[in-house]
Amino acid sequence: MNNSSLENSASLKVILKQRKKKRLLIILLCCLVMAIAASLVVYAMRHAVSFFRMPSEITREDILTGRPLRLGGFVEKGTVRYVGESGVIFFVTDNKKHEKVVFNGALPDLFREGQGVIVEGHFDKQGFFIGTRILAKHDATYMPKETVDRLKKHYSVEK
C-alpha cells in the first residue's frame, strides 16, 4: 500500500466519524424536542383531563382556588331538596365525607338518592360545590326507559 491510499483511508475514517457524530447529535436533538413537546402537551392537558374526585379526596386547595373539577360519589339519601323551578341542593358522599352540591338545570333521568353521580363544577367562596353538569351513573343491571316500557308492553300483551 502506498502512502496516498493510507491517507485516503484515514481521511475517509475521519469523515465517517464526523458524519456519525452529526447524525447522533441530530437524533438527540429530535428526542429532546419531542420530550419538550410531550411535556407541554401534558402540562396543557392537566386540567382538561379531569378524573373525578371523591368527597374524601377534596383538598383545601380545591375549595380555595375554585378551579373546575369533577366530584364523584353517591347522592346521599334524604338530602335532595328542590329549589324553585330547576334548582336542586343535595350532598354527594363516599361514606367517609360528603360535599354539598348546588345545581341549577335539568337533571338526568337516572338521578335519584343513593345513585352514583359525577358532578362537574367548582367550589364557591362559601365552600359549596356549584355544579354545572350532572352525569348519573348506573349499575350493570341498567336498562333504558324505552326498553323497560317496551318490555312491559310486550309482557302485558302476551298475558
UniProtKB/Swiss-Prot annotation:
GO terms of biological process kind: cytochrome complex assembly
Repeat is among the record's keywords: no
Periplasmic side: 45-159
Topological domains, Cytoplasmic: 1-23
Topology relative to the membrane: Single-pass type II membrane protein
Family: Belongs to the CcmE/CycJ family.
Record-given protein name: Cytochrome c-type biogenesis protein CcmE
